[in-house]
Regions:
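N-terminal small/glycine-rich loop or linker at the start of catalytic domains
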Residues: 7-23, 76-89, 112, 117
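Alpha-helix N-cap and loop-to-helix initiation/capping positions
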Residues: 27, 31, 61, 88-99, ...
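Active-site-proximal loop/turn and secondary-structure-junction residues that shape catalytic pockets
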Residues: 22, 53, 79-83, 117-122, ...
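Active-site groove signature of glycoside hydrolases
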Residues: 105-125
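Short, acidic/polar
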Residues: 27-39, 92-108, 156-160
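N-terminal binding-site loop/beta-alpha segment at the start of enzyme catalytic domains
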Residues: 1-74
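Acidic-and-aromatic substrate-binding clefts and catalytic sites of carbohydrate-active enzymes
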Residues: 24-28, 50-59, 122-126, 153-154, ...
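Beta/alpha (TIM)-barrel catalytic core signal, keyed to glycine-rich beta->alpha loops juxtaposed to Asp/Glu
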Residues: 125-312
């Protein structure tokens, strides 16, 4: 496994991370334990969850699975999204953050969170309040690093500039939606992160499975797959996208790799990507994703792939 620095920090995370939004739901406790142990054996040390995944059950499942293994992982979780029906059960206020960090620590059965991420921007809470609270959590030792998620470039820039002026800890990472067919991040987020050394953590790297190549043009989606009923996956099922996947699948296979490995390797070729967060519901998914860390695209290969993606 390859390890990379998490943005402008000394923390090293595995190039392939483990996404756990289905843990505690579709993935039961037995499978969670198997997947987590298997991921650690493969060298994956970065695990990402959130307080809202499966209404907190993802964190609970991880807390059980990671007993005796905390020294082998870097745990990331998130706050801001609604966790209840009360008026203060959401947002980036000091009240909600302080309440929820304690709840996450209880569910995870640990005394600290390695990377605490703001799940989205909060228009209702003064940024100063949010950042001061996060700085206090780092000072207390309950949180070691902070990150953002689903932020625009101007929001990330404003937050880190304010943190610099006030002497508070900055966001070291940004977790946003980014893959071969979702490239909006290349307009502003990626240039900003490259310039200011903020680590990028792409999520949904396989476009819900479409970038594995398992969905075939003109064929029904496999029974039980997301492609059967997920609008997110189905929106990628266009002739133009099938053309690209078919070409890239053949290109990858000529080099002894799969389309899924190429989708990960392409993200890892981006300069500021620290870790690609790959969700898994089976150990075999983790094993397949981990192989991508060993494939470093050359500049020429990267250009060839971009040529296909750009329709050249």
């Amino acid at each position: 496994m390859q390890y990379r620095l998490l943005g402008n920090s000394g923390l090293r995370v595995s190039a392939i991370g483990l996404g756990t939004n289905q843990f505690g739901g579709k993935v039961d406790q037995l499978d969670t334990a198997q997947i987590v142990s298997g991921a650690i054996d493969l060298g994956i040390n970065f695990i990402d969850t959130a307080d809202i995944y499966q209404q907190g059950r993802s964190e609970e499942a991880l807390g059980v699975a990671l007993k005796g293994k905390w020294d082998k992982v870097i745990m990331a979780t998130k706050v801001v999204s609604p966790t209840g029906d009360g008026p203060n059960d959401k947002g980036a206020s000091r009240y909600h953050i302080m309440q929820n960090v304690e709840a996450s620590l209880r569910r995870l059965q640990t005394d600290h969170i390695d990377l605490y991420q703001m799940h989205r921007w909060d228009n209702d809470t003064p940024l100063e309040e949010t950042l001061r609270t996060l700085d206090d959590l780092v000072s207390s030792g309950k949180v070691r690093y902070i990150g953002a998620s689903n932020y625009a470039a101007w929001q990330l820039a404003r937050a880190n500039l304010l943190a610099e002026v006030r002497g508070w800890v900055p966001f070291v990472s940004i977790q946003n939606h980014y893959h071969m067919f979702e490239r909006e991040q290349e307009r502003e987020i990626i240039p900003f992160c490259n310039a200011h050394n903020v680590g990028i953590l792409p999520f949904f790297p396989l476009a819900g499975g479409f970038l594995t190549g398992k969905y075939k043009r003109g064929e029904a989606a496999p029974a039980g797959s997301r492609g059967e009923n997920s609008p997110y996956v189905q929106k990628y099922m266009t002739d133009a996208n099938y053309d690209k996947v078919e070409k890239l699948t053949a290109w990858a296979e000529e080099r002894g790799h799969t389309m899924g490995e190429l989708a990960h390797a392409w993200l890892l070729a981006q300069p500021s990507v620290s870790s690609v967060i790959s969700g898994a519901t089976k150990l075999s998914h983790v094993q397949a994703n981990a192989k991508a860390a060993d494939w470093a695209l050359t500049a020429e290969e990267f250009a060839e792939v971009n040529g296909v993606l750009n329709g050249e």
